[in-house]
UniProtKB/Swiss-Prot annotation:
This is Tetratricopeptide repeat protein SKI3. GO terms for cellular component: cytoplasm; Ski complex. PANTHER family: SUPERKILLER 3 PROTEIN-RELATED (PTHR15704), SUPERKILLER COMPLEX PROTEIN 3 (PTHR15704:SF7). It is found in: Cytoplasm. It comes from Arabidopsis thaliana (Mouse-ear cress).
Amino acid sequence: MELEQLKKSVEENPDDSSLQFELGLYLWDNGGDSEKAAEHFVLSAKSDPNNAVAFKYLGHYYSRVTLDLNRAAKCYQRAVLINPNDSDSGEALCDLFDRQGKEILEIAVCRDASEKSPKAFWAFCRLGYIQLHQKKWSEAVQSLQHAIRGYPTMSDLWEALGLAYQRLGMFTAAIKAYGRAIELDETKIFALVESANIFLMLGSYRKGVELFEQALKISPQNISVLYGLASGLLSWSKECINLGAFGWAASLLEDARKAAKASSELASSMSCIWKLHGDIQLTYARCFPWSGGTENSEFTLKTFSDSILSWRSICYSAALSAKASYQRALHLAPWQANVYTDIAITCDLVSSLSDDSDTSSSWKLPEKMVLGALLLECENSEFWVALGCMSDNSALKLHALIRALHLDVSLAVAWAFMGQIFRESDEMKFAKQAFDCARSIDPTLALPWAGSADTYARESTSDEAFESCLRAAQISPLAEFQVGLAWLALLQGNISSPQIFACIEQAVQRSPYYPEPHNLHGLVCEARHNYHTAIASYRLALAAMSIYPESSVKSHAGKVSINLVRSLSKAGRFKESVMECANLKSKGLLDAGGLQIYAFSLWRTGQNDSALSVIRDLAGRISTREKTSIAFPISFICSLLYCISGLDSAITSIQKMPKDFFQSSKISFIVSAIHSLDQSDRLQSIVASTRSYITSQEEIVAMHYLIALSKLLKTGAGDFLGYEKGIAHLSKAIHMYPHSNLIRNLLGYILLAGEGMKDACTASRCCIINVSECANKEGLKSALEVLGGGSVACNVIGNTAPRFSFPTCHCQYLNAPVVVVELQRFLHQEPSNSSVRYLLILNLVQKAREQRFPRQLCRAIERLISVALSDETCSKEGEYKKFQLLLCASEISLQMGNIAESINHARKASSLSLPSSYLFLGHLQLCRAYAANGSTKNMQEEYRACLELKTDSNIGWICLKLIESQYNLEPDANLLEMSLQECSSQKKNSWKEWMAVYSLARGLDSTGKKDFFSAEEFLAQACSLLNSESCLLLCHGAVCMELARQSNDSQFLSLAVKSLSKVQASSLFPLPIVYTLLAQAHGSLGSKEKWEKNLRLEWFCWPPEMRPAEVYFQMHILARQSEDRPETTSGIENYQSPEKWVIRAIHTDPSCRRYWKVLDKLVQHPMS
């Protein structure tokens, strides 16, 4: 029907171009007569010569039906001329020209269309492809960028643009273009491969390998992908080798080997694939790590030997495989000279791993292979260097390197090997010059740095030697460089550093058959206090000596054995240490140092008589030693005699020693330490004579440290230390040496442990935090630990801007750092430091208490406590820390409402093996938890347990008294009073303070019971003991105000005014609420002026973010008073009207009806 209608319309209007075209299009699309359709297209074009679509379909007719390509081209050209945006006509025309080889016409059509219309995106696209084919990269980029605006989702365009960028060297832009192409079409192999190659070239090996693996999933049999993947994994493994990650490198090389093997099966005639496979196998043989190390618990000589043989076998088979692959590559491409040198290097490695020496010929196989390379490229300087390295003939070696320098005088590697030859010949001057030349040419070459390190070491410039060797080891992690670096670090006393530990770990992996790396690894682990690993390393060193062929190395077995017994002793394995020492003594290998370890181990195993016998043997050897080396043995003898025989025996032995023995600062310290324990001062004269040998400032400071400890011990009474004398001595010493952190930290620590409540604030002023010095020696307290402990004792220390409380302690005015921040910073640097984590937890608990235990902070504390409790320690100090952590966990759980968990933590704390004085606090926490749970029976049991255990903690008794009063437990007031007075009397300097706190607690308890007369008596008693404490005076003033309200007695108002006035006089900064109470008191006494003054002062006591609603309401009262007196306009209350003050009070506390009523009155009856 539609065809009939179209024909009828054409018959009626034969000159209508659109009707002719529609009829022709219908016939074309519906399989009608194409010739008839073409006739109608011709008629349409004649009627409307600008109908581009008609010319397009005529072009289709001539190109597809009649195959008249010339007519088709003319029709398409006409269509494009009329409408340059017609992509179908343009593409069809370009395809015709392309098939005919008319590339110039194709370019002309595209240029003409692109110039006529910027939306002719097909033309830009086609032009970009042609320019890419013609390698006109810059022009192609412009055309493709324009085409992408029209076809932003066409992946081929992005891929072509990426190629153009890549050829221009714009690699970042190329990666982005390829990436967009891959996003649009994940199967774009070319984009994946080329972007991966770019990543490899830029050193991003991981990303390159990931892209190759993605391409491999799409095309598993693609040779380019397999080759690229293998080369990427090889490059990535070399990066890992340079970082010392040999195990990771070996696993990467195993994957690379599989990829290279697969590509060789697909294209076995390509020499580059076999060369790549050889490179992979050679690198694998060089980097495969030995894994039978210190973690092997079942160590025997056989297992060690088997592990070495297994490791050698793996490396040897990889080297043989590399040799075979290189030979196959050489067979396929015998003109490749560099393959000869690869075979030479591989043969040399095979020879070193097999221990076979070819003596049948004067020329070794590696030398012959290098000569083969030189026959092909005799002017290649690198081949001459290779010949110099492979040859054992010194003359030929020197000749080859000189020849290489003749060809290229700036060849750094030739200068480096030349320097090595001179060093081996002991020509150190020439060696130094050669190494300097190599370094100046190429600073990234490792050998010149290592050679310079050897030169500096011979010249006794250890710092330069260490830095040079460190540089060499960083550039190339060879075992020889790393071992040398460890020796230099040992000489400098820096062997425990992380750099040395990493280097020696890597050296052990690559040279397990050599004893020296194992011995150095043991020394490093020992310096890092990892004694069990050190023991295993020393035993591995001894095992390596037993299988090592050179006798010169075996002669050092005695030194390694001494290292072993020392580590056994430090690890607490004294029985094994005694056995090893006895074995060494029977062989005559036990020197003075070994005898000291032997005696110490015997004493620790309870064999005191044998230990004394060894000490006598050691003392007999002292007379034959030089005076400079007798200080340490004598100090050891004195210390061990004190431990075995006691103080009197040690003093007697010291008095019998010749005076020449005391001419050392080390002995002076030991004698002074023993003297500090002697109340009779029998060593006074000897101590005085030895002090003259303490000359350096460091030693003088340390002696002051020891003298202060001596005064603590000697001037104390009973079980209490003499804090006053120790503090006095340190106070003098700190004036002489104000920059000594040792004295500062000790003074702070003693003040912190003292009796005075304000000593914590003084202690915080002594310490200066230096994070680099926080990792102190064992037994010494760091400044961070002192400040951390001080901020636990007094929450204000380090909290320079309290936002949740109004502390009255003067510590708040110290410009101290925020302790929590410093603790977090140091814990971030050393996550394994349990002491810092412990202090951080305690400080965070204090912070949570100040902020009323916010849930987010409580959860963070719970996580920290969980980590800390998982770090089990067996020492008494560790038990006490665990006790504190469990109490903190219990408190946090209690505040978060998890009562059962709180009780569980408190029970665990109460079951620890600690003195009863500490366990008292655990049962006190159980009392609080059961009280919160409503379990009265259990609370009474824990209350009685506290009474039985007792404590020397004043605050413990006070808290128990509060619990007793609040929950009406069975009172035993006499026992509590007596215990508290006894506890306070032992602390002479602070008994008044504690009794005042106790009176405060009783006063608060009476206030809670509405017994204000008793409360006033208790608080007055507290104020008489501490008449300058703001908290006590404030409480007393508030209670007096309540009594005055109840009894209408002006005497209580006077007492309130007196106490509250003292509060502000004793506070450096005004406290809130005090002025309000004073205003009430003065108002009741009839002083309106003082009433107004104090209300105004109350406004300034509050920080803006903490002002309560009542303060705004007070301002409304003053504002109304000011309206009655226009002359008073200078007050803060006049800044706003009374209505606005009330509105601000309502905004702060909208639940107060009183404010709403006042506002209603003000609105209804505004004042004039």
